[in-house]
Amino acid sequence: MTIVRSRAGGGFTLVELLVAIAMLAIVVSFAVPAYSDFVMRKRASSGINDFLVDLNAARSEATRQRRNVVMCARGGAAETCDATTQSAACICDDQGQWENGWITFVDINGDGALSAASIDALLGVHPALASGVRFREASGDGSIAFNSRGALAGTVSRFALCINDDAGTQDDEDVLARARFVDVALTGRAVVSRAQASPGSASSACYVSPSS
């Protein structure tokens, strides 16, 4: 007598496949927004950290050289300005769009602006921040200077760094949660804080006063 043995199929049934796809869709629906938020928070942290490093370096250099050292938002054809090429393209942006990068220089002639290489000394150039980042100074003049004592050569400064959402809005709850502020006291010391405000209270630059 011949015995016929049945062999189980090695694949999935249609029902099993549909269930697996549905489960994958659920996982992705939670994972993608979380990953997107993680990336945006990393952008904010990276931008703030770079700014603080350069800010502290400028302050130290001012005390070392006993001259004013200025950091200003990059303007003009910024892509042709680097730390080794102090050309006419290395100019400050008086509109204060710090997300385009910034320039640090020794203000030898004391005019607050980056002059020719024979006059002022360029210390460094930071490239533009990641796409979607908005980094502005509350005063809007686009520069901050330290004197020979490491203190501010001017009034206190506040900087706001915001990460826009996919729709480009800047005042919803998520954007405020990702916002970071840098307050520079007259002593030259910088402090980072987070936004403490309800949705809708931020301006287009998300300048929100942190809670005391």
Residue spans for each PLM region:
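N-terminal single-pass transmembrane signal-anchor helix
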Residues: 1-40, 54
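Short, acidic, Ser/Thr-enriched surface-loop or helix-capping motifs
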Residues: 8, 109, 185
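Conserved RecA-like P-loop NTPase ATPase core
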Residues: 35, 58, 146
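Juxtamembrane interface helices immediately C-terminal to a transmembrane segment
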Residues: 36-47, 63
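Alpha-helix exit/C-cap motif
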Residues: 45, 53-79
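Type IV pilin-like appendage domain
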Residues: 69-145, 201, 212
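Cell-surface, membrane-associated systems
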Residues: 118, 137-212
